[in-house]
Amino acid sequence: MISQNPFDPKGFLTLAETLASNPAGDQATYRSALSRAYYAVFLVARESLTTKGVISPSFSASDHGLVIRTLRSLNRQVGDQLDKLRRKRNRADYVLTTQVSQAEAMQTVATANALRTKL
C-alpha cells in the first residue's frame, strides 16, 4: 500500500548526513551526499514559497532557477547559498573528473542544514 502522506524532503538531508559521515565512502557516496543535500533544501524552499503563494512551480527543471531567483529577491544571502549548493550538485552529478572529498561532503551537508533552518 502506498502512503498518502507526502514525502518529507528532510529525509534527503538525513541520507546526505549518513553518506557524508561514512569514512569508507567512495566518489559515488560523497557525490550522492552533495546531491541529496541540495535537493533537500531545494524542495523545502520550493514547498515553502509555494505554500506562501509566492511562486507557482511547474515541477520541472525550470523550478530550480525560479526558486533561487525568488529567494534572492527576498533574501540575497539565502538565494546565493542555495545557488552555491546547486552548482556543487551540478559539478558532483555531471563532471566526471571532479573529486569530492569526505570533508567537502560533510561541509556541504552542514551548509544545507543551516540553510534549511532559514527557510
Segments predicted by a language model, with ranges:
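Terminal alpha-helical segments
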Residues: 1-119
